Amino acid sequence: SADWHLDSPFGGFTQAQRKLLIQEQRKIPGKIADLCRREECDMVLLAGDLFDGEASWETLAVLKKALADCGVPVLIAPGNHDYCAPGSPWLEESWPENVHVFTGGLESVVIGALDCRVYGAGYQSMDCPGLLEGFRAQGGERYQVAVLHGDPSLAKSPSCPITTAQVRDSHLHYLALGHIHKAGAFQAGRTLCAWPGCPMGRGWDETGPKGVYLVTLED
């Protein structure tokens, strides 16, 4: 999942409408935690922009509880709206033990029980260089996946441009992306690259397919 944009201002709506929309938006983390348990997921990948900007304490409390309730490893790659800078909740808050936040350049963690290596990176400003440039998965684990906030549609985008060639040459099994608010996917080489869109549109300009992806990795 990606692009929750919690605490969005919802400009253009009345005060009553904004209040209702914020309440509905805060239900997203809990709904995804419920889905995770119901589907018996092995891990959760969150590809950035979970916050629209500054996060309220109410939203932080809801998010922490939901992430803990997932009960499995949760790996987060902050994006251009919730980037890791001084004062960021990703750096300043304490997160549940099952949560790993990628706060800098491309790195990886191994989930031994799944024989899986997960690569990720976090934005440190609103702009980010091409994180997959020259990258190739090197781990010996059975599954090689990555979670990034990136733009697969514009090669010159400042929001971590991702090219088809970079996806192909990564030799990942799966690349989970955020940033694009309409769901999409493509295959390049052995790598499936997918972005689920935002789970809740914030205006009439955010229609179309969106939600979350349930992904099964097979040999």
State the predicted function of each range.
Residues 1-62, 140:
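N-terminal active-site segment of His-dependent metallophosphoesterases
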Residues 43, 53-194, 198-210, 216:
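His/Asp/Glu-rich metal-coordinating catalytic cores
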